[in-house]
Amino acid sequence: MRFVAPPPRSGDNSPSPSPSSGISEEILSRSSDPPLEFSPPLIAMVVVLAAAFLFVTYSRLISRRFLSPLFRRFRRWRCRRRRLLHLSSASSASTSSSDLRSFSPFPFDSFHYSSYSPYGLDDSVIKTLPLFLYSAAACTGKPAVGKTSAANCRDCAVCLLEFEEGDYVRTLPLCFHAFHLECIDEWLRSHPNCPLCRTAILGSAGVLTPMSPFVPLMAPRIRPSLDDEENNAIIIRGEITPSRSNWNTIAADTTNDQEIRASVEEQSSPAISRFRELKRSYSFECERESESERVTMEPATVSPWRYRRSTWNKRQSPFGNLISKSRVFSFRYYRSTKSPFFRRRSSAGVFYPISERIPATGSSSRRTKSMTSPMFFRTAPHSSSRLRCGDPEALLSPERWRRRDTCRAEM
């Protein structure tokens, strides 16, 4: 069978559209759409961010180039102004309040804050320290082994400011730390060491460490100062001691020479010996005895129980009249009240162990000898805790010397 195609219709005579014509139509349709519009809030946000970025960048550039030197100069000017104000106030105070300055414990003529500490260095010593001009080109140097090079110090540790080209820098001799000239000079007037590492400026042998002028308020009651009296006694001794030429003229006779030396020592030595004995008694909390007294007191002082008693006994404070009851815990007192091995003898007022009150039969120990010594029972009623504590009032009281004289008379 054959299929016959139908004849074309009259309306289908137009040609089919080509693909190029379809693409052009799509482009025309897209171009006819309305353009994209940005909202005003979005535009405002973008503008604000851009302005902030420009402002921060500009401020950083200005602060690095211009503001940091201005702030540095302003701080230096303020420090100099403060120093001038202190100096002017010190000069006015020195002229108007001479009585107050004489009462002040500081041996200085001005009230400048740098002179409050007596441990600083003198200006003549400070001026001997090396002085340099700072150079940024020298910052590339490497420090020595175990030391810090001045070239690596880019800022001052006192004022916390960076060094500038041409600044006067003072370098410390031992630690090689560098600081501004004005900063380190002001520091060294009140401190003898480095602000960073605390290294002594002049070494251990050259540090100026005078004695502190501060004196405790309660020192005269507890321990009087005997340094001035000892120095005066030494000066008097130097005045009394004859010169070497006088000794050579007197040395013709040996006996006369010895007599003169003995007389000079008798005139000057009692004061010095008394002061030294008192100072040692304050240190060891006991009084120095002569050789004869030590020999006679040997049986009463060699007992280990006596040392234990003096060690654990409750000390009385020299300010006992101000305190109603002692708050210091005493192991000796607590043990004596709780332990059955200790009994109290009401006549002597001293605690004795049972082994010492009733010595063992058949043998005698040093402890029993010390307890049976007549000197112990003579001195026990007269013993004072103030003497054991090293109270100066008890050491210097006439009652103590009267008791010693009575003890010697009884011997």
UniProtKB/Swiss-Prot annotation:
CDD domains: RING-H2_EL5-like. GO terms for molecular function: transferase activity; zinc ion binding. Its main location: membrane. Keywords: Membrane, Metal-binding, Transferase, Transmembrane, Transmembrane helix, Ubl conjugation pathway, Zinc, Zinc-finger. InterPro entries: ATL1/ATL16-like (IPR044600), Znf_RING (IPR001841), Znf_RING/FYVE/PHD (IPR013083). It is found in: Membrane. It is a single-pass membrane protein. The RING-type zinc finger domain mediates binding to an E2 ubiquitin-conjugating enzyme. Pfam families: zf-RING_2. A zinc finger (RING-type) spans 156-198. It comes from the Eukaryota. Residues 1-32 are annotated as: Disordered. Its EC number is 2.3.2.27. It catalyses: S-ubiquitinyl-[E2 ubiquitin-conjugating enzyme]-L-cysteine + [acceptor protein]-L-lysine = [E2 ubiquitin-conjugating enzyme]-L-cysteine + N(6)-ubiquitinyl-[acceptor protein]-L-lysine. Belongs to the RING-type zinc finger family. ATL subfamily. One of its GO terms (cellular component) is chloroplast. This is RING-H2 finger protein ATL65. The keyword Transferase applies. GO terms for biological process: protein ubiquitination. Residues 10-21 have a biased composition (Low complexity). It is an enzyme of class 2 (transferase). The chain crosses the membrane at residues 36-56. PANTHER family: RING-H2 FINGER PROTEIN ATL16 (PTHR46913), RING-TYPE E3 UBIQUITIN TRANSFERASE (PTHR46913:SF21). Pathway: Protein modification; protein ubiquitination.
